[in-house]
Regions:
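Conserved PLP-binding catalytic core of the aspartate aminotransferase-like
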Residues: 332-370
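Short, intrinsically disordered, charge-balanced linker/junction segments flanking boundaries
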Residues: 8, 36-42, 368-370
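A structural motif shared across PLP-dependent enzymes of the aminotransferase-like
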Residues: 1-27
Length: 370
């Protein structure tokens, strides 16, 4: 399923081997030939012997656990190579657990978003095109890397959509530029993609050159720019649980975090370290702590998120509610709405009369349900 959506370039190329499982195919030769034995390599999802020899895809039961597995192994490798060294990891907006995991590494998370963009609202509250307020500030990224030194930036993260910035989308052009800058300095680019399908929808609807492309086609291009990703699959996977860590086979992340002998052979494969952590903490790599039912629900849900009509209805509901608040005079409504929620700036709502120590947002929520 992940190969279909993130690597095969659209619905016309999908294999949908899920249907064999869903229809309870009992033909052993068919299942072995199409499901269990095919070998895939070179992308984000190795299969067959390649996944056994160079594991690069790891099912985990939820996103923050997947993130924790990744960051614990990264921490272990960096600590062994550079004891006591403090690293900096930039993002367009670290999710709170990402920021927490980075701090637990002893590293510094940096958020490089456009603060000045977030609360700008045009006359009447309507944008002709989404301004992609979730974009990373590319100039700040270049400045940060050169200021601290590229050797002190082990990873660049990109949160898609930008969860801390009110679920605002990230443009394909911005993703391409983040990739360019990161690779210029030999730094792997890691996506946090809990809401990948929403982001693809926003790109389709608002970015030049993508109107005629499907969500799945856009997803394939988007994922081509990353060296790895962490995912909570409970959002755009339509499932009760699920997550994943994956990195590109023999790509920049693998090169930077594996150890090699003098003759170039692999001494320690970072994928093996991740697999050991996955199995020891969450479950065998065939299920990662998830039930068969949840794995099937996730596989079905991933395809469902590629349905334009579904995604259009979902995102439109958020915009409808946000516009309703704005027209009713509610202060601080963030416009345009993201794809999963409506956000209100509590500083503006309370006219700056509430300090952060008063937990204005929590108080506001309590008043709504009192």
């Amino acid at each position: 399923t992940f190969r279909d959506i993130f690597e095969r370039g659209g619905e016309k190329n999908w294999k949908k081997i899920l249907d064999l499982v869903r229809t309870d195919c009992r033909d052993v030769e068919t299942m072995m030939e199409k499901v269990y034995l095919p070998e895939y390599e070179g992308g984000l999802f190795n299969g067959g012997a390649a996944q056994m020899e160079r594991p690069n895809t790891f099912i985990i039961q939820q996103g923050r656990a997947a993130e924790s597995v990744l960051m614990e192994i990264v921490k272990k490798i960096l600590a062994a190579r550079h004891p006591g060294k403090v690293f900096t990891i930039p993002s367009n907006g670290h999710f709170d657990t990402t920021e927490g995991n980075i701090k637990q590494m002893g590293s510094i998370p940096r958020n490089l978003y456009h603060k000045e963009l977030l609360y700008q609202v045009p006359e009447g509250g309507k944008y002709e095109k989404n301004p992609f307020k979730g974009n990373m500030d590319i100039e700040k990224l270049e400045q940060l890397i050169t200021a601290v030194g590229p050797e002190n930036v082990p990873l660049v993260f990109t949160c898609i959509t930008n969860n801390p910035i009110c679920g605002q989308p990230v443009s394909m052009g911005n993703i391409r530029e983040i990739n360019r800058v990161a690779h210029k300095y030999n730094i792997p680019l890691i996506f946090d993609v809990a809401r990948w399908a929403e982001n693809c929808y926003f790109i389709k609807m608002n970015e030049e050159g993508y109107a005629d492309k499907s969500i799945a086609e856009i997803a394939t291009e988007m994922f081509s720019y990353c060296d790895g990703f962490c995912m909570s699959a409970k959002k755009d996977g339509h499932a009760n649980m699920g997550g994943m860590v994956a990195f590109r086979d023999k790509g920049l992340f693998w090169q930077n975090f594996s150890d090699f002998n003098e003759d170039g052979t692999v001494k320690t494969d970072v994928g093996v370290l991740l697999k050991v952590k996955q199995i020891s903490c969450y479950g065998n790599d065939s299920y990662g702590g998830m039930s068969g039912r949840d794995i099937m629900a996730l596989a079905v849900g991933m395809y469902e998120s590629c349905d334009f009509n579904y995604m259009h209805e979902r995102v439109s509901q958020c915009e409808y509610l946000a516009q309703g608040f704005y027209k009713a005079g509610v202060k601080g409504v963030v416009l345009p709405a993201g794809g999963h929620a409506v956000y209100i700036n509590m500083d503006e709502f309370f006219d700056g009369k509430r300090g952060h120590e008063t937990f204005a947002g929590e108080g506001f929520s309590l008043e709504l349900i009192r």
